Amino acid sequence: MRIALGIEYNGTNYFGWQRQREVKSVQEELEKALSIVANHPVEVQCAGRTDAGVHGTGQVVHFDTNVNRKMVAWTMGANANMPSDIAVRWAKEVPDDFHARFSATARRYRYIIFNHALRPGILNSGVSHYHGELDEKKMHEAGQYLLGENDFSSFRAAHCQSLSPCRNLMHLNVTRHGDYVVIDIKANAFVHHMVRNITGSLIKVGRGEEKPEWIKWLLEAKDRKLAGATAKAEGLYLVDVDYPEEFELPCVPIGPLFLPDNLN
């Protein structure tokens, strides 16, 4: 049988999602815990591989097993055998043609900036910090130039292995919640560092270095060297993954923390 899981994790202490030799990864910790519950080696497939220091509230994985367990065993059992900064949020049996990555129709990320003169203490590893003034309205205006099917070469990491830089960006909203500026972005898929590179460029607009129209020029230039610096990893969250309704996956609050599902 095939089981899908919803996963939440704080990526601070991990070298990214993907299992690697000699370093800690979220995937490795999850697979070890699931293997204990299943009493056989378990290998998971994920919706999206996040980089070192990046967090997730809406990661989705699937794995195959021939053992019969109640769904609560996969949630409670896995959580009992994992570090406290990783948690299974839900479990559901799915058809054999479900695939966490290839069945997904869209991914959604949120980037959180603590916009205050002084750095945060409690949330220091869960948000990015920018001390100067940011105009979130101009950042939002700039972001609208990126909507639709576009070549995102200007926002693509130099070592990105994707065969194509083209992606369909479905929405990009920038909102302020007190001292927190949130960039909410959804696309069918993302090239490597795309969200963080877009964020770095929007910050240049927000602090008045560039006008909103600069983002349109940057997109058309297709040159990573012209864009802003890559924003830090700690502010980024994979918050949601869309799948066809036929799979009937659970809907849970995407967060993180206090943030509602819809930001206006």
Curated annotation (Swiss-Prot):
It holds the Pfam family PseudoU_synth_1. PANTHER family: PSEUDOURIDYLATE SYNTHASE, TRNA PSEUDOURIDINE SYNTHASE-LIKE 1. GO terms for biological process: tRNA pseudouridine synthesis. Substrate binds at Y109. This is tRNA pseudouridine synthase A. It comes from Vibrio parahaemolyticus serotype O3:K6 (strain RIMD 2210633). One of its GO terms (molecular function) is tRNA pseudouridine(38-40) synthase activity. It catalyses: uridine(38/39/40) in tRNA = pseudouridine(38/39/40) in tRNA. The active site is at D51. InterPro entries: PsdUridine_synth_cat_dom_sf, PsdUridine_synth_TruA, PsdUridine_synth_TruA_a/b_dom, PsdUridine_synth_TruA_C, TruA/RsuA/RluB/E/F_N. Keywords: Isomerase, tRNA processing. It comes from the Bacteria. Belongs to the tRNA pseudouridine synthase TruA family. Formation of pseudouridine at positions 38, 39 and 40 in the anticodon stem and loop of transfer RNAs. HAMAP family: TruA. Its EC number is 5.4.99.12. Homodimer. It is an enzyme of class 5 (isomerase). SUPFAM superfamilies: Pseudouridine synthase (SSF55120).
